[in-house]
C-alpha cells in the first residue's frame, strides 16, 4: 500500500499536465542565457558631444619689447646728417585690438575624452605700428653739417597692416565633466600680414614708402575654464599668451623734406628696419554649445 501511494505522488504532476495543457511543464534544466539579450540589457555609454563652438569677443594686448630702429642704405645728402645703424633711444610698439571671435573645437576619442583640438576664427586684426622714444620725439635729421634742416619729428604713427594669425592648440580638460571644467592648452600660431602700408604724414609727404612685414611664428600657452549653463550650453573665459613671436618690419625708400635747406629740398633717408617682440596676451569671453 505504501508503495502504491509513493508511485501516485510521483505520477501526479505528469497526470495534471496531461489534463491541463496550459499548466506549466515540469521543471527542467534552464538553457544558458542568450548573450545577445545580455548585451542588449547592458546600458549604453553616454553620448559624447565631440564638436563645440563658442561665440564671443577677443581682446589682443601685445606685451611688446622693441629693439632700436635701424637705418640702412643711406646715401647722398642724407649721409651728411645720418649714418647706417641703430637710432639711439628709438623703438616701436604695436597697438591693441578687439575683435568678434569664434572658438571651434573637436574632442578626440582618447584619454577619456580629455583632449581636444581647437582654433580661433575671426576677422583680420588691424596691426598698427607706432614709433616710440627718439624716433617719435626727435627729427630723423635735425642738422646737416651743423645747418638746421627743418625736418620734423615723425610722431607716434608709423604704419599699419591686416593680420590673419592662424592658430591651433591642443587643449587638456582637467575636469572633463561637471558644471565647471578648467583646462590648459599648448599650440602654435604664425602672424601673416597683408596690405601693409606706411601711414606717417611726415614719411609720406614726399613719396609713399613701402612697408613689408615678415611672417612671425609663436608658441601658444593657454588656460581657462568653462561653466555649464544648461545641458549643452557653456560660458567660457580663456587666456592665451603667445611667446617668442618677433615681428620684423621694413620701410623702404624713405624720403623727407628739408625745408630749411632749399638746395636739396628732399633727401633720401633709405631704409628703416624695425624688430618687435610682440608676445601678445589674448583674452576671450564666449558662450556656445556642444554638438
Feature-to-residue mapping (PLM):
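Short glycine/proline- and aromatic-enriched beta-strand/turn motifs that initiate or cap beta-hairpins
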Residues: 19-106, 282-284, 288-290
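Residues on the lipid-exposed face of transmembrane beta-strands in outer-membrane beta-barrel proteins
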Residues: 55-57, 102-106, 121, 166-172, ...
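Hydrophobic, well-structured mid-protein blocks that either form specific transmembrane helices
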Residues: 157-189, 193
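Gram-negative bacterial Sec-dependent N-terminal signal peptides
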Residues: 1-17
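Extracellular/periplasm-exposed beta-strand and loop segments of Gram-negative cell-envelope proteins
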Residues: 63-97, 124-164, 190-216, 244-282
Amino acid at each position: 500500500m505504501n508503495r502504491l501511494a509513493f508511485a501516485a505522488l510521483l505520477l501526479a504532476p505528469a497526470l495534471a499536465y496531461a489534463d491541463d495543457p496550459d499548466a506549466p511543464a515540469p521543471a527542467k534544466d534552464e538553457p544558458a542565457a542568450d548573450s545577445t539579450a545580455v548585451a542588449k540589457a547592458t546600458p549604453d555609454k553616454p553620448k559624447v558631444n565631440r564638436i563645440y563652438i563658442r561665440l564671443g569677443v577677443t581682446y589682443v594686448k601685445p606685451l611688446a619689447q622693441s629693439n632700436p630702429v635701424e637705418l640702412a642704405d643711406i646715401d647722398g645728402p642724407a649721409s651728411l646728417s645720418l649714418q647706417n645703424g641703430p637710432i639711439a633711444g628709438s623703438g616701436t610698439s604695436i597697438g591693441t585690438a578687439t575683435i568678434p571671435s569664434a572658438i571651434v573645437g573637436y574632442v578626440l576619442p582618447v584619454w577619456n575624452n580629455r583632449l581636444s583640438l581647437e582654433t580661433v576664427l575671426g576677422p583680420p586684426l588691424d596691426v598698427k605700428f607706432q614709433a616710440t622714444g627718439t624716433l617719435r620725439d626727435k627729427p630723423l635729421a635735425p642738422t646737416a653739417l651743423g645747418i638746421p634742416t627743418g625736418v620734423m619729428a615723425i610722431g607716434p604713427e608709423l604704419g599699419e597692416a591686416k593680420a590673419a594669425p592662424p592658430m591651433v592648440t591642443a587643449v587638456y580638460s582637467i575636469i572633463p565633466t561637471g558644471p565647471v571644467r578648467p583646462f590648459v592648452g599648448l599650440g602654435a600660431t604664425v602672424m601673416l600680414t597683408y596690405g601693409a602700408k606706411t601711414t606717417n604724414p611726415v614719411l609720406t609727404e614726399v613719396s609713399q614708402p613701402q612697408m613689408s612685414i615678415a611672417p612671425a611664428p609663436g608658441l601658444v600657452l593657454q588656460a581657462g575654464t568653462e561653466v555649464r549653463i544648461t545641458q549643452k550650453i557653456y560660458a567660457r573665459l580663456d587666456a592665451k599668451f603667445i611667446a617668442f613671436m618677433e615681428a620684423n618690419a621694413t620701410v623702404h625708400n624713405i624720403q623727407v623734406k628739408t625745408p630749411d635747406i632749399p638746395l636739396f629740398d628732399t633727401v633720401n633717408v633709405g631704409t628703416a628696419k624695425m624688430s618687435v617682440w610682440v608676445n601678445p596676451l589674448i583674452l576671450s569671453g564666449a558662450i556656445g554649445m556642444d554638438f
